[in-house]
A protein has these predicted regions:
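Beta-strand-rich, repetitive solenoid scaffolds
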Residues: 4-9, 14-20, 26-32, 36-40, ...
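Extracellular and organelle-lumenal recognition/adhesion modules and their flexible linkers in secreted
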Residues: 38-314
């Protein structure tokens, strides 16, 4: 029996053996070459959550006004926007090709800037420190030809500050030259060893005084090559989003009688103890106790159903 032995560059071997049989056979191998990005073959490839924009708990596809010079406004889950000069409209819209959804900003007179960004918590980005990563995104813009990307890390763990008073350190920045044709753009980023406290990725444009800016499939991954977009199943993507924000519809919680305490468990453990709004069909809420796993409260009038919002955003 003959064999071929392939040695690894560290230890161990792979042996390909042919059985001891009479006669001979021929196996023709097709010519070709290619590469495999082993960094991202398994696991949590895209560190940007909801890059597919499928989860939109706040607006469910409806348009949203982003108020100029205001605090950041969350849009589709995990993504926030802010603008300067004048208000703009943001909305999840139909995608292009196999991409189900894109996110679109519509410009307005006097707009001087629009920003679209995500903050990645320490637990999901710590291992990127000292590594090379690739940022990729699809974009088009019917008015402007330049989109700036910027990467930051938080100065203290999971604390990024506000739009007016950021507490971050810039890692790198660059510019994509875009057009009205929906195309992919990529950038390589060297993450410093100090970036162990959370990462922020920001896309920005200038005076979008008209027209539209369309964004799709943003991805941040280990390695120096942009690979295919990481499509996660919807249940997992929703759960990842609910770690930061939950919109529970009316009837999720029921208060059967007056002033009786009722408890509710969150669908996932939240990032930190959330701020909450509980809205009953009648009466008022009191005695609320909240943890990362759920809450309990009483309602002055029952029976009544209630809805709630819980936010643990960065």
């Amino acid at each position: 029996m003959s064999s071929v032995v392939i040695s690894g560059n560290t230890s161990g071997t792979v042996t390909i053996a042919a059985p001891a049989v009479a006669g001979s056979g021929t196996q023709t191998l097709q010519a070709g070459s290619g590469t495999v990005a082993l960094d991202n073959t398994f696991g949590f490839k895209n560190r940007l959550i909801n890059g597919c924009f499928r989860v939109d708990q706040r607006n469910n596809g409806a348009s949203q006004t982003i108020t100029a010079a205001a605090a950041l406004a969350y849009t589709v889950d995990r993504w926030y926007a802010y603008c300067t000069g004048a208000n703009v409209t943001g909305q999840r819209v139909a995608g292009t090709g196999s991409n189900q959804y894109n996110y679109q900003f519509t410009g307005a007179a006097s707009v001087t800037g629009i920003n679209f960004a995500q903050r990645i918590e320490t637990l999901n980005s710590y291992d990127l420190n000292g590594q090379n990563v690739t940022l990729s995104v699809y974009m088009s813009n019917s008015l402007l030809t330049s989109v700036t990307w910027t990467a930051y890390y938080a100065n203290t763990s999971d604390t990024f500050g506000s739009v007016a008073s950021p507490t971050v350190t810039q890692i790198a920045t660059g510019t994509f030259t875009v057009s009205s044709t929906y195309s992919q753009y990529t950038a390589n980023i060297a993450i410093p060893a100090a970036a162990t406290t959370g990462i922020q990725i920001v896309f920005s444009v200038g005076a979008q005084t008209s027209g539209t800016w369309v964004i799709g499939y943003p991805q941040l991954e280990l390695g120096t090559t942009a690979t295919s977009f990481d499509i996660r199943d919807h249940t997992r993507e929703l759960s990842m989003c609910q770690r930061y924000y939950i919109s529970a519809p009316n009837g999720t919680m029921v208060f059967p009688v007056n002033a009786q305490y009722q408890s509710a468990q969150f669908p996932v453990v939240m990032r930190t103890t959330p701020t909450m709004t509980i809205t009953p069909g009648s009466g008022s809420i009191s005695g609320t106790t909240i943890t990362t796993m759920g809450f309990y409260a009483a309602c002055s009038l029952g029976p009544t159903a209630a809805l709630y919002l819980a936010s643990a955003e960065l």
